[in-house]
Structures are given as C-alpha cells and as structure tokens.
Amino acid sequence: MIQAYFSNIRNIILNEIHNSKRDISIAVAWFTQRDLFNAIIGAIDRGVNVSLILINDIINRNEYGLDFSLYLQKGGKLCFVDSKKVLMHNKFCLFDGHLLITGSYNWTYAAEQRNAENIITTDELNVCNDYTNYFTSLWNGLTEVTEYSRIRLSDIVEDNFLQE
C-alpha cells in the first residue's frame, strides 16, 4: 500500500522509528531534528541496528547541531558523503526492510516548521527492495565514520567555502 502525507510528517516518522524491531536505514541530506535523533538513539538502545548516511557539511557537523558522537557511542553506524564531490540529496528511510518513507522531507527543524513538505510511505516489496539495494550501494561506496567531530563556525574560511 502507498500513502501520501503533507502534514504531521515528523510524527509519522517517529511512530515508525518506535515500531522498528530490527533495522533502520536512513539516507537524508540534512539532519538537525532533535526529536528524531533521540528516537533513533532510543531505537539503538532497544537493539535496533541503525545506519545513517548524511552529507558531510556544516549543517550536519556544526558545533550547535546534533552530536553524532553519542550516536556512534551507542552503536549507530554513520557514513558521510563528501559534499565537494556530489550533493547527496536523498531523503528516505527504510524500516525493517519492509516499509519505506521517502519524499521532500529532510530531518530538520526547517522541514518541520517552515517548509511545505511531503512524504510517501509504502510497504510494496519491490520498491522496498530497490531502495534497500540503493542504500547498500551508497553505503558500500563510502567509508564508515568511527569518530565524529564538530566544525566550529568560526573555523570556516568564507572565501574557500564559497569557491567549493
């Protein structure tokens, strides 16, 4: 079954995180939403395997953002995509290999508070399998992060940032 949603998206995702039993695979460009972060930490604490792919940029690594070192310490798996090579603009999540959420929704406060966003959910096996294979392909092309550090905003050299 396929369903489309245009509101209450954060709560839909939270519900699926809480219902997951085995694994969660997440590929989102940006992740700043603390409620979703806390929910995936809770999933790890329940024994759920969580794998996360994010863009390696200031939004995901700034000193005021989410502390992914806690996520790693709890046993979460993390890969960053080099934003200088490609803009990984995906926004999807697989729950236990049989439910997919995808759409325009980044896991950010802006997506929740300001943006007009949408998602679809599906349990169609062929679609979930396609996304599982795509996630595995993305993951296998990256290096898993074992240590996480934040970027201080004051350390960014504006000229270099604008040239990239």
Regions found by a protein language model. Give the residues of each.
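PLD/PLD-like phosphodiesterase catalytic module centered on the HKD motif
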Residues: 1-26, 33-164
